[in-house]
Design a protein with these regions (language model features):
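Secondary-structure boundary/capping micro-motif
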Residues: 1-238, 243-411
Length: 411
């Protein structure tokens, strides 16, 4: 660097007093010696040694310390504040999911007097891109990273009667074919009884229904499945579960045969066979109620009250993206997704859902306020959090000690 500066200092005076043709030759020599770009070398030679005299001071120009160009931000603080409010209301989703639904969400929030912005701010909101949304919200995004454990006890007696799901047997483009799973709320301690959430996800529309049960007894899970089925906006045509005994049982098998529901199961120890519902286990259930231990009747009732609002919030207002294709390029996998749509919009687009059912959904949608639903969910989450007291954790510790003692001393 010092050698380059010495060459520039020696060449600059000769360059500044030379004619145009001579300057071109001097410039070529400097580029060859220093490996500067021609434009940068020209500017260094032209401005080297120049002096500025602001007031009584005399400053020598150093072109290497050029001030960055100042440009006013197009998306100002008003846009960022409105975007932040909508983003929080939409449960902190990414820009690619948020941007396609932004125009509709602005209309809905204005209709319910939840969003107030001037005409220019609204125009900017409607033209913002997904990448810009992520950039503007970058400082607010790094939160809520949680991990969980799966606890499924296999059921083996009826496996040979329930076929493993294949793509030939299922029509994943038709609403009504869904995956089911249980999410355990054991709080990291699997001893004793604790609440379970039954999660049913439709593959075609991503419509998701959840219901809490007191434990994973077959009778409770079967009763919850019947209730969940009634909430679906289309007929239930197929069920796919893991190999847990709460699903692989004679009662559910006879029920599916009687109701003409295709009942299949995933391959043992292949968790990705149920990838759709496993994704919702986190994005809907875990994000809403966390990883604490819930093992009382009061907590089970609170969970179901929360889920009654959560189903409206997620199915009508939270967009989802579905994978269209995967292509391996070298060591990387390039994935392509469809446009983000809410489950409600996917149901309306389906030609296999009746017009009467679509009209019912439109009527229901017109009455819903997403901001009010979000506030209600947050209040219920706070009530649920208060029930996880220190006494609860002491009871967990006691059950762990009892279980450990039984293992070490079986008599």
């Amino acid at each position: 660097m010092q050698q380059r500066q010495a060459v520039v200092a020696k060449t600059a005076a000769r360059y500044q007093r030379s004619r145009k043709k001579e300057k071109s030759m001097i410039l070529s020599e400097l580029v060859e010696l220093t490996e500067y770009s021609r434009a940068y070398a020209r500017r260094v030679l032209r401005q080297h040694g120049q002096r500025l005299k602001p007031g009584k001071q005399s400053l020598v120009v150093d072109v290497r310390l050029r001030a960055p160009r100042q440009r006013s931000a197009f998306y100002d603080e008003k846009v960022k504040a409105a975007l932040l409010k909508i983003w929080r209301m939409m449960d902190y989703i990414c820009g690619k999911r948020m941007q396609p639904a932004l125009a509709e969400m602005v209309v809905v929030l204005e209709r319910h007097n939840e969003l107030h912005c001037d005409r220019l701010t609204k125009q900017k909101l409607l033209r913002v891109s997904a990448a810009t949304i992520d950039r503007l919200l970058r400082t607010e995004r790094r939160k809520y990273e949680l991990r969980g454990k799966a606890r499924t006890k296999p059921g083996t007696l009826l496996k040979h009667q329930i076929p493993i799901r294949t793509f030939a047997e299922w029509d994943e483009q038709q609403p009504g074919f869904g995956e089911i799973d249980l999410v355990g709320h054991e709080g990291g301690v699997a001893a004793g009884d604790y609440c379970q959430t039954l999660d049913l996800t439709d593959i075609a529309t991503t419509w998701t229904e959840t219901l809490a049960v007191r434990n994973k007894a077959q009778a409770r899970v079967f009763e919850a499945l019947q209730k969940v089925r009634k909430n679906l906006p289309f007929p239930l045509l197929g069920l796919d579960s893991d190999n847990g005994s709460e699903f692989i049982n004679d009662e559910l098998l006879r029920y599916c045969k009687h109701e003409r529901i295709s009942f299949t199961r995933s391959r043992p120890y292949r968790k990705n066979d149920s990838c759709f519902v496993e994704q919702k286990n986190y994005s809907i259930v875990r994000r809403a109620v966390g990883y604490a231990r819930y093992d009382t009747d009061e907590q089970c009732q609170l969970l179901n009250e929360l889920y009654s609002y959560l189903r409206l919030y997620t199915n009508f207002f939270l967009p989802t993206m579905k994978l269209k294709s995967k292509e391996r390029v070298g060591s990387r996998v390039k994935k392509r997704y469809d446009q983000a749509l809410t489950p409600y919009q996917r149901v309306l687009q389906s030609k296999l859902v009746s017009k009467a059912k679509k009209d019912q959904l439109r009527t229901k949608y017109a009455t819903l306020n997403p901001a009010a639903l979000k506030r209600k969910l947050e209040r219920l989450q706070q009530r649920l959090a208060k029930t996880t007291s220190q006494t609860n954790w002491r009871e967990c510790a006691r059950m762990v000690a009892v279980t450990a003692a039984q293992r070490t001393n079986p008599f």
